[in-house]
């Protein structure tokens, strides 16, 4: 093992630059030559591969996004383009490639691995959705949760001042993790996610009772997976008789200064990935499991459905409980 490369694929997350910094510094520390692949799998096809140096990662640890850029590649789905990508890696003498991304990126990595036996591939879960099976944490999640927290705290100020209901839509793709954790930690009165069935009649009874007792505003957090945010806004106005507003947080959840936790997790993920490559590991994903960083088969990560921890879901079910009273 002499030369290793790294790329970012799919949606960007805060913490990727911290991962790049650790990649360069730890590679040199282990006597390896680090390479950057710009623009994800697209860059792999277009041979945008170059040696990396300390100067390339100076000052980037506190910056969100990724210095080497990312992409979603349609061309990469075709074997002819993947063969070009492999030849480009071989042309630079690359022995191992680290891929930061989600399940789609890992499926692409699996295809590369199946089509060659002379290059090692290791994935690092990187998505704010936190929806990757086999790992309890994905890079970027903590920064995203803190961005959502700041937004909801600010919205609560105006909601309480005007006496309104605010329905806040958060990202997560098909997973309700972001919405659930954000609702719990921001004191929301309603949380709607695909993993927990809900009954609006139960909420109606509780909210009308709270209005009679003097409550003047409500905060609802809704997962984008449900695709019903506008419907919930209308429900508040028609059933609860309160002026309502919708806020779609959108891509502010992806950017921003990485938290200390994401920076530290980036260092751990990359260290484990490089160590795995040096040991001859191929076609694996570094997963965080009960405080440990473990390499797991791609098929156990990219091809399985992520399930939110049952203890966390139990807290989510309490939102419809009459005992669930938030301040």
Curated annotation (Swiss-Prot):
Recorded E.C. number(s)? 2.7.1.11
The keyword Acyltransferase belongs to this UniProt entry's keyword annotation = no
Inhibition and activation profile: Allosterically activated by ADP and other diphosphonucleosides, and allosterically inhibited by phosphoenolpyruvate.
InterPro entries registered for this protein in UniProt: ATP_PFK, ATP_PFK_prok-type, PFKA_ATP_prok, Phosphofructokinase_CS, Phosphofructokinase_dom, PKF_sf
In this chain, ATP is annotated as bound at 11, 72-73, 102-105
Q: Which residues form the active site?
A: 129
**Cofactor dependency:** Mg(2+)
Q: Respond yes or no to whether keyword ATP-binding is given for this record.
A: yes
Task: Provide a GO CC annotation, any one.
Answer: 6-phosphofructokinase complex
Locate the residues binding substrate: 127-129, 164, 171-173, 224, 245, 251-254
GO terms of biological process kind:
canonical glycolysis; fructose 1,6-bisphosphate metabolic process; fructose 6-phosphate metabolic process
Ligand binding (ADP): 156, 187-189
Chief localization:
cytoplasm
- Catalysed transformations (reactions): beta-D-fructose 6-phosphate + ATP = beta-D-fructose 1,6-bisphosphate + ADP + H(+)
A molecular function annotated in GO for this UniProt entry is:
ATP binding
Q: Name one Pfam family in it.
A: PFK
Q: How does it assemble?
A: Homotetramer.
What family does this chain come from, according to its entry? Belongs to the phosphofructokinase type A (PFKA) family. ATP-dependent PFK group I subfamily. Prokaryotic clade 'B1' sub-subfamily.
Q: What is this protein called?
A: ATP-dependent 6-phosphofructokinase
Q: Which organism is it from?
A: Sulfurovum sp. (strain NBC37-1)
Q: Which gene encodes it?
A: pfkA
């Amino acid at each position: 093992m002499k030369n290793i490369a790294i790329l970012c694929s799919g949606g960007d997350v805060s913490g990727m630059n911290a991962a790049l910094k650790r990649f360069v510094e730890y590679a040199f520390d282990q006597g390896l030559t680090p390479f950057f692949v710009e623009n994800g799998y697209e860059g792999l096809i277009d041979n945008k591969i170059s040696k990396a140096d300390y100067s390339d990662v100076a000052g980037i640890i506190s910056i969100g996004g990724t210095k080497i850029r990312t992409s979603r590649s349609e061309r990469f789905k075709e074997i002819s383009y993947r063969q070009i990508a492999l030849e480009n890696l071989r042309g630079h003498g690359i022995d191992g490639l680290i891929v930061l991304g989600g399940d789609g990126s890992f499926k692409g990595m699996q295809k590369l691995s199946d089509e060659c036996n002379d290059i090692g591939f290791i994935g690092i879960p990187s998505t704010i959705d936190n929806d990757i099976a086999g790992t309890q944490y994905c890079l970027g999640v903590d920064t995203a949760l803190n961005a959502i927290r700041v937004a909801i705290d600010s919205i609560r100020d105006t909601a309480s001042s005007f006496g309104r209901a605010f329905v806040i839509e958060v990202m997560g793709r098909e997973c309700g993790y972001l919405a659930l954790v954000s609702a719990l930690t921001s004191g929301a009165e309603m949380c709607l996610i695909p993993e927990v069935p809900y009954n609006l009649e139960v909420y109606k009874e509780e909210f009308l009772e709270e209005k009679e007792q003097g409550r003047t505003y409500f905060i609802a957090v809704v997962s984008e997976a449900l695709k019903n945010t506008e419907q919930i806004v209308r429900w508040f106005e028609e059933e609860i008789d309160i002026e309502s507003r919708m806020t779609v947080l959108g891509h502010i959840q992806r950017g921003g200064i990485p938290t200390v936790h994401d920076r530290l997790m980036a260092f751990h993920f990359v260290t484990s990935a490089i160590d795995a490559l040096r040991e001859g590991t191929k076609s694996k994903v570094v997963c965080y499991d009960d405080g440990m960083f473990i390499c797991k088969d791609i098929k156990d990560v990219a091809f399985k459905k992520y399930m939110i921890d049952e203890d966390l879901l139990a807290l989510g079910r309490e939102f419809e409980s009459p005992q669930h009273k938030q301040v």
